[in-house]
Regions:
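Active-site glycine-centered loops adjacent to acidic/histidine catalytic or metal-binding residues
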Residues: 3-4
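Metal-dependent phosphoesterase/phosphodiesterase active-site architecture
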Residues: 7-200
Length: 200
């Protein structure tokens, strides 16, 4: 279990990236969402593990609504189950994985991505769960292809994201599209924008 990206995601590793299949899927990265409400409602996961193999049997994601009247009250937020991985994704695969003792193996998750390719409703529901239903937009065409590619790219050299090198110092802030870090760990971009404004 690794992460964080502030989103509900996973990535599959393969013994042979040239022949990605359920047979070559050999590792998993579970990327949990954040308690920080920057990309959706706060959420956390509880994993169920096999006590002998330590394989993941299921996880349940819990979330709270930012719009709830109790969110910032003295009683605190109310956490409720958002979804179970096995209950949500288990029925999607050709041989449904629903029994409590069945592991959610890398092969299982590869088969889930195959189901996403064929079942657009299931894929769009996955996209909505990434942010716990917050700010959801449709992901079709290249977006869908890239997202499924990324789910199958646990090793960095197979990453599907397109990186544009360089720094863009546009003066027109309406045209500038700056991707902010959701963790707010670096203030360099903000500082450079302020300097550019003063120079302009």
């Amino acid at each position: 279990m690794i992460g964080h990206t502030h989103k509900d995601e996973f990535e599959i590793g393969y013994s042979n990236y040239a022949k990605q299949s359920f047979a070559t899927a050999n590792s998993m990265s579970y990327i949990a969402p954040a308690l920080t409400p920057t990309s959706g409602s706060p959420a956390f996961r509880i994993y169920s593990l096999d006590p002998v193999t330590f394989g993941v049997l299921d996880f349940t994601e819990y979330s709270t609504s930012l719009e709830s009247s109790t969110y910032q009250s003295a009683s605190g937020p109310v956490w409720a189950p958002y979804y179970s991985a096995k209950a949500t994704y288990g029925p999607l695969v050709t041989q449904p994985v629903t029994t409590p003792s069945a592991e959610l193996s890398p092969a299982f998750w590869h088969n889930v991505t195959t189901a996403f390719e064929a079942n657009d409703t299931a894929f769009q529901e996955y996209v909505a769960r990434k942010s716990r239903g917050w700010g959801v937009s449709s992901c079709t065409g290249d977006c869908k292809t890239d997202e499924i590619c990324q789910l199958r790219a646990a090793e960095a050299q197979y990453n599907c994201a397109t990186v544009s090198p360089g720094i863009d110092f546009k003066r027109d802030e309406a045209q500038a599209k700056v991707k902010e870090s959701e963790c707010h760990g670096s203030k360099v971009a903000e500082m450079l924008r302020k300097i550019a404004k003063r120079v302009a």
